[in-house]
């Protein structure tokens, strides 16, 4: 046995000892089942105010609860690291959240044990992300051969990694992309339902997996916020804003590209323009970009106040896949933005395409300068946001989610 395995074993022993001391007992009767029961497994307890995938999954959970579906949530965390500030938040919503406990014999009830115990009563297992489906689908199906297996792609990982390879020419990325393609296609074969997050991902998947009737589209949920008296006009706004978690490589690349290539061109025209970068899990290489005009604000719990004083949102994403929550979030608040084709994927910008979308460094800089200084174009872009978001309404998504559960 390796030293790492021994350390993990010892930490698990200490956890079990602590649970015994505190009398944290597992009782199946503490969990609420109903006529329809859904098991959701993700890498983490969704951090809905930190990343787009977590926000989307949280909204799906809320829709399930609204429709009287019992939800059981499991995170693929190590037993001795099974901690999250978000566990209680989901419990407060009415979600059955797995947490380590001990059985009547004093044995640790692991997440795998929990899955085996509840799955005979589960109707649908919603496995979120490729590695989660690959890891847990067999365990779930063995515990209940009749369970409906849902593979939620979140985004087409193969496409995201391949695009990154095409940008950086790193052979390791190409190998990683090919690895994920095998995982994702195997998952598609084993799933009863495959969820793509955008029409683009769905069409790209067709090139590799032709069982189209299995694949459904469930995108992000974005509700446009109607302008009120508190909505700040063009004249009362300043600065650029980028939002994104730095656990996600496309965000790190976009911020470096913005600072090192795009903004020097913008600053020639608008020397005092400030850029605010909001996002959790900031790394050392991102910290090194900070300056008086390029502010790293870290994690901000409530973005509303920042968004309502910002003049322009920027997202110069050079690779990625799926729907970008940051784009929808900007549109929700009628905040004009400048992004790339990758950033805009899944959204129909219509007549605003030529105003808000650019794919070269010079064009990105030009569009930022134009929208930051041109009130007429800014107002038109702001007023177009509601129409762009229409396909992402809660009513549309609710119908799609309920179809997956009941059909």
Predicted regions and their residues:
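Membrane-proximal helix-turn-helix segments that form the acceptor-binding/catalytic region
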Residues: 157, 172-194
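Conserved catalytic-core segment of nucleotide-activated headgroup transferases in glycan assembly
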Residues: 53-58, 189, 193, 207-211, ...
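Short hydrophobic beta-strand element within catalytic cores of glycosyltransferases
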Residues: 326-330, 336-340
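A short, well-ordered alpha-helix in the C-terminal region of glycosyltransferases
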Residues: 377-391, 403
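C-terminal alpha-helical cap of glycosyltransferases
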Residues: 394-407
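Acidic donor-binding loop of glycosyltransferase active sites
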Residues: 122-123, 192, 305-322, 333-335
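Conserved acidic donor-binding segment of nucleotide-sugar-dependent glycosyltransferases
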Residues: 355-361, 370-375
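Non-catalytic membrane-proximal stalk/linker segments that position and tether the catalytic domains
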Residues: 1-47, 53, 86, 93
């Amino acid at each position: 046995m390796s030293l790492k395995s021994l350390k993990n074993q010892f930490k698990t022993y200490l956890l079990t000892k602590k649970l015994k001391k505190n009398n944290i007992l597992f009782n199946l009767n503490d969990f609420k089942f109903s006529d329809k029961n859904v098991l959701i497994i993700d890498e983490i307890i969704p951090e809905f105010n930190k990343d787009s995938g977590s926000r989307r999954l949280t909204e799906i959970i809320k829709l399930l609860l609204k429709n009287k579906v019992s939800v059981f949530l499991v995170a693929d965390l190590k037993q001795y690291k099974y901690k999250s500030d978000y566990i209680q938040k989901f419990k407060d919503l009415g979600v059955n959240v797995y947490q380590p406990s001990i059985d009547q014999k004093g044995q640790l009830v692991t997440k795998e044990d929990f899955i085996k115990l509840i799955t005979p009563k589960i109707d649908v297992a919603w496995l979120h992300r490729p590695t989660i489906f690959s890891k847990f689908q067999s365990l779930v199906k063995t515990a209940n051969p009749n369970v409906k297996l849902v593979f939620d792609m979140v985004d087409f990982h193969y496409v995201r990694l391949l695009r990154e390879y095409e940008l950086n020419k790193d052979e390791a990325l190409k190998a990683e992309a090919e690895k994920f393609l095998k995982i994702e296609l195997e998952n598609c074969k084993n799933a009863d339902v495959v969820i793509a997050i955008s029409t683009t991902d769905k069409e790209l998947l067709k090139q590799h997996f032709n069982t189209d009737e299995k694949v459904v589209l469930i995108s992000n949920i974005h509700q446009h916020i109607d302008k009120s008296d508190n909505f700040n006009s063009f004249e009362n706004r300043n600065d650029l804003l980028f939002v994104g978690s730095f656990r996600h490589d496309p965000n790190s690349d976009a911020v470096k590209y913005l600072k090192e290539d795009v903004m020097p061109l913008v600053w020639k025209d608008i020397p005092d323009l400030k850029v605010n970068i909001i996002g959790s899990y900031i790394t050392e290489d991102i910290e090194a970009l900070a300056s008086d005009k390029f502010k790293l604000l870290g994690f901000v719990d409530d973005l509303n106040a920042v968004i309502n004083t910002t003049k322009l949102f920027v997202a110069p994403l050079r690779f990625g896949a799926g729907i970008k929550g940051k784009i929808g979030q900007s549109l929700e608040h009628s905040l004009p933005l400048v992004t790339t084709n990758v950033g805009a994927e899944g959204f129909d910008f219509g007549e605003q395409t030529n105003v808000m979308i650019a794919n070269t460094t010079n064009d990105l800089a030009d569009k930022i300068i134009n929208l930051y200084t041109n009130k007429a174009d800014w107002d038109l872009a702001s007023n177009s946001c509601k129409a762009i978001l229409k396909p992402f309404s809660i009513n549309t998504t609710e119908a799609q989610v309920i179809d997956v559960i009941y059909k």
